[in-house]
A protein has these predicted regions:
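ALDH superfamily catalytic-core signature
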Residues: 1-131, 155, 193, 236-242
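Conserved C-terminal structural/oligomerization subdomain of aldehyde/semialdehyde dehydrogenase
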Residues: 14, 26, 68-72, 80, ...
Length: 242
């Protein structure tokens, strides 16, 4: 019987100099912090062209400041708690590791215990500009923590985006030509372009093929093409003698 193994992701997004920054900010916040970053398809690595980085950071901070954190059973709250005490403590360790190893924590970083949040593991979403040698660029955290790097040449951005053992999902914000370039070179099984409802996410079940590359999985599903179809077939030699 065929086996589909989905092994997680360390998912990147590239924002080019020609991106719609409002769409980019919306998609980045939703993807990095939705469900508390506790999903395999969450965005955790952001590469932004240096020409638009400052403007995008302003928009990201505005959207992050508007996030309402609290009881997820109440509709007015967009961000609920992390899953348990271990995740809550890991969050604090990761934030300390960012600050202690040369990163600039641009927004977030606090564990929240006031204003009715003492009965749960609530944390602020984090945006941090981190040096490329920081180990958290490589580690899947499963938390609302996003690292950012400014790039000058888009080939550098692509090299960095692909510099991972994983390849589940990836996103881009840019022009039509940027999108074509991205899709030719990115090493990920599920890609999105200019999607303000989530820069990275999984495939839409029943409508899109799904499958990770590299360490993110073996095989795919949804029978999207002849690449996957043979995995669900078995050869049988039949001989009839009359």
């Amino acid at each position: 019987r065929p086996c589909i193994a989905e092994m997680g992701g360390k998912n990147p997004c590239i924002v080019t100099a020609r991106a719609d920054l409002d769409h980019a900010a919306a998609g980045i916040v939703r993807s990095a912090y939705g469900m508390g970053g506790q999903k395999c398809s969450a965005l955790s690595r952001l590469y932004v062209h240096e020409r638009v980085a400052d403007a995008l950071i302003v928009k990201l901070k505005q959207q992050m400041a508007a996030v309402r954190i609290g009881d997820p059973t109440k509709r007015e709250h967009w961000l609920g708690p992390v899953v348990n005490r271990h995740a809550y403590e890991q969050y604090a360790r990761y934030v300390d590791a960012l600050r202690g190893n040369g990163a600039d924590v641009i927004a977030g970083g606090r564990q929240l215990r006031e204003d009715g949040l003492e009965r749960g593991w609530y944390v602020e979403p984090v945006l941090a500009e981190a040096p490329l040698e920081h180990p958290l660029w490589k580690q899947e955290m499963f938390l609302p923590i996003l690292t950012l790097h400014r790039y000058r040449e888009r080939d550098t951005a692509m090299r960095l985006a692909n510099d991972s053992d994983m390849g589940l999902t990836a996103g881009v914000f840019g022009s039509d030509e940027d999108v074509r370039w991205f899709q030719r070179h990115i090493e990920a099984g599920v890609t999105y372009a200019n999607r303000q409802f989530g820069a990275t996410t999984g495939a839409w079940p029943g409508y899109q093929p799904f499958g990770g590359w590299k360490g993110s999985g073996s095989s795919g599903k949804a029978i999207a093409s002849f690449y996957y179809l043979p995995q669900y077939l078995r050869e049988q030699s039949r001989t009839v003698v009359e």
